[in-house]
Design a protein with these regions (language model features):
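Soluble extramembrane regions of membrane proteins in the secretory/endomembrane system
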Residues: 1-58
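Extended, low-complexity, polar regulatory segments
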Residues: 40-72, 110-151, 429, 608
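Reductase modules of NAD(P)H-dependent flavoproteins
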Residues: 51-77, 318, 437-441, 446-452, ...
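Membrane-embedded alpha-helical bundles of multi-pass integral membrane proteins
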Residues: 83-101, 133-353
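Transmembrane-helix exit/juxtamembrane "anchor" motif
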Residues: 103-124, 217-225, 298-304, 347-365, ...
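Non-transmembrane, juxtamembrane loop and terminal tail segments
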Residues: 122-149, 366-385, 566, 570-596, ...
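Membrane-proximal cytosolic interface modules of multi-pass membrane proteins
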Residues: 298-302, 307, 311, 315-327, ...
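Ferredoxin-reductase
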Residues: 367-462, 527-528
Length: 690
């Protein structure tokens, strides 16, 4: 060291070697002072150790000096190892930085949008930039062909999300494939191949560890980034799933690379005993947990057995963290620190959930549930504290405390609310409309049918329920700033429309609707079961008639009965009839023709013979039209655009909620309508499923 190192280099190198001894052996090097009395003449008399001697395993009983060649090889070995350690740290931080930049972009966009909506900032340039982003990136789906999407059932993923995910994977692949330096005379490895396998395995593991806190953060519903960026939970959940898939690939590569390295470098004799080491087999537990967690999180499994998915997913998440806790210390304490953010994020999310539950719900709160057999729909009503006004379009997580799975919670969109304030009590009644599927809703239906009262109407079953809600969640949107609000709804997504209409009802009753620009509201609803429509009309829409009678706001409803499109053309089917009879002033009302549908349109208030045009079946306030078949969404939106071209405001609020295929078409319709320079379209697509 005296011969090849400078004074500063000697001190740094000695400190580095001493640190290695402390970390790996738990001891310190002997002090440098023990060789202070060694002279240069004595050093020259020592044998010279060469690289060839190390290969032959030569033994010396005296002190030796290192030749120039071996020193250079040793220097290159240590330098290359430290260089690879630094690179895998930096590359892992680069992935975290990538998501930081994405969140920063979303935050800036959300802030600018807030300034523009609040009239603080009015800039044509900023408006054009925002319109450009929404038209070409934020809203359009990956595929722009409707028929292709229906044939291959491709998801309606927004283009910007797809671009972000693609860039993330490209960066991950590049960081995994570049900047390796292997040489044959490495003192740590016997072969170049084992050297590469070790470097690849270590880098893959480092990328996984750096990804974990981000993946955990994006999975929580009480994520502060939701508020900062204005993105919905579905966006972060999409990112969470793709980060998880990247982690599964990287952890598989890490495990295979390290196993190949250990087997080739050590041989079977030393490789097999490794499986008895705690850090080794717990690493296998963590790797298998991540891979299985990703496989069981596939869409078919989530939809078919969601309850099982939830238990398995959380169990594997815990097993992953426990496995990493025992596996990572072998590489030092640096990587163990990445476990704590995951625990902190999870704990914060659960704490906020508990706070929300205690804040909103009363200990002796009243809840009820009613099941309608014909519509196969459940209406939940639960009373909560009057803390804040309910937000239209928001959703809550519902807990069923009498269930054996009381820890589960399921999200449902708020369909309406009632505010009660008397001398004795004050509360808000939240109303949810739930289409019965498998899992929680099916179990709830079974409970209602099992406890059915003889006095209850044969078409429904109702009872008190022990329920609590946690929320609200979801992004804010106000369609009443536009002259026309168009709701394009599919199936149970009607709760989005009824929720916004409840907000408008409150504005009308308080007289605050005059501060809004809204003049026309049109709801286009595609529904399979006519009985579902009848139930919604009786419980929600019938009340709109009296409220809007004193206003100049036009209400219209187009109901597309998709079940009829599957029937034979010779079949006839009774359509729902409103219980309230039209008054004298509406008997001679002109027929309201809806935009074209994807099948032949024919309708009447009683029977549906083939080949007839749609006929109005509503009263004077809510003009209702029934149409057989599915709506052609592009034609629906285009007809509203044509109407607005001759108006003063020329602004349309387009709100959509429906299955993946409908959401895909709604996005495409917005893109096409946004090309019209005369009419401004404000777009909002509410989540249909989770």
């Amino acid at each position: 060291m005296r011969e090849y190192c400078s004074e500063n280099g000697l001190s740094e190198g000695w400190d580095g070697l001493n640190q290695v001894c402390e970390d790996d052996g738990g001891t310190e090097l002997l002090p440098w002072s023990i060789i202070d009395n060694v002279t240069d003449a004595e050093v020259k008399s020592w044998p010279i150790l060469t690289y060839e001697d190390t290969l032959l395993g030569a033994e010396f009983n005296t002190s030796v000096s290192v030749d120039q060649g071996l020193f250079q090889i040793g220097y290159q070995t240590i330098f290359d190892w430290e260089n690879q350690r630094t690179k895998r740290h930096n590359y892992g931080y680069a992935l975290v930085g990538f998501w930081g930049l994405i969140v920063l972009f979303g935050t800036m966009h959300n802030f600018i949008r807030y300034l523009m909506n609040s009239s603080i900032l009015r800039s044509k340039t900023m408006a054009r930039c925002q319109s450009f982003i929404e038209r070409y990136f934020a809203v359009p789906p990956i595929l722009t062909m409707r028929k292709k999407n229906r044939i291959f059932s491709m998801p309606s993923t927004p283009r910007l999300q797809a671009i972000i995910i693609s860039i993330y994977f490209i960066i991950s692949i590049v960081l995994m494939c570049v900047d390796y330096h292997a040489f044959s005379e490495n003192l740590y490895f016997t072969k170049k191949s084992t050297q590469l396998w070790r470097y690849i395995g270590d880098r893959a593991g480092a990328l996984v560890i750096n990804n974990l806190p981000v993946m955990w953060l994006f999975a929580t519903r009480n994520n502060l980034l939701l508020w900062v960026t204005g993105w919905d939970f579905a966006t972060f959940n999409t990112f969470h799933r793709w980060i998880g898939r990247a982690c599964a690939i990287e952890i598989f590569l890490h495990g295979m690379a390290v196993c190949i390295y250990q087997y080739k470098e050590l041989g079977t004799e030393y490789f097999l005993p490794l499986w008895k080491d705690v850090d080794w087999y717990m690493g296998v537990v963590a790797a298998c947990s991540i891979i299985l967690m990703t496989l069981f999180a596939s869409a078919p499994i989530r939809k078919s057995v969601y309850d099982l998915f939830l238990i398995v997913h959380q169990s594997f998440a815990v097993a992953c963290l426990v496995g990493l806790w025992y596996h990572l210390p072998v590489d030092g304490p640096d990587y163990v620190n990445f476990i704590w953010p995951c625990i902190a994020v999870w704990s914060f999310d659960r704490l906020v959930r508990i706070v929300r539950l205690l804040t909103w719900n009363k200990f002796a709160s009243y809840s009820s549930a009613e099941y309608n057999r014909d519509g196969n729909v459940i209406q939940l009503r639960t009373r909560v504290r009057r803390i804040a006004s309910p937000c239209p379009g928001s959703y809550y997580y519902v807990y069923g405390w009498r269930s054996l799975k009381f820890w589960e919670s399921h999200p449902f969109t708020l369909s309406g609310w009632n505010t009660v304030k008397t001398a004795d009590e004050s509360y808000t009644e939240l109303i949810f409309l739930i289409s019965v599927q498998s899992g929680f809703t099916s179990s709830l239906r079974g409970q209602l049918l099992n406890h059915e009262s003889p006095e209850t109407d044969s078409s429904s079953a109702a009872r008190k329920a022990c329920l609590s809600v946690e929320g609200p969640y979801g992004s804010n949107f106000c369609p009443w700033r536009s002259e026309t609000a168009l709701f394009v709804i599919g199936g149970a997504g009607i709760t989005v429309a009824t929720s916004f209409m409840q907000d408008l009802v409150d504005l009308v009753q308080s007289g605050m609707h005059i501060d809004q620009r809204i003049k026309r509201v049109k709801i286009v609803w595609a529904v399979k079961n006519p009985a579902f429509y009848q139930f919604v009309y009786e419980r929600y829409m019938a009340a709109w008639e009296a409220v809007f009678a004193s206003t100049d706001i036009e209400l219209s409803l187009d109901v597309y009965l998709t079940m009829l499109s599957k029937m034979d053309s010779d079949d006839e089917m009774s359509l729902p009839e409103h219980r309230n009879e039209p008054n004298e002033s509406t008997k001679n009302m002109d027929t309201v023709i809806s935009p074209s549908s994807s099948s032949n349109s024919h309708i009447t208030t009683e029977k549906v013979p083939s080949g007839e045009a749609p006929t109005n079946a509503g009263t004077g306030i809510l003009k209702t039209t029934f149409v057989q078949g599915r709506p052609t969404i592009n034609d629906v939106v285009r007809s509203q655009i044509e109407t607005l071209r001759s108006s003063e405001e020329k602004q349309l609020a387009l709100v959509g909620c429906g299955p993946a295929t409908m959401a895909h078409d709604i996005r495409l319709s917005f893109v096409e309508s946004s090309n019209d320079a005369q009419v401004a379209v404000d777009f909002h697509l509410a989540p249909f499923g989770w």
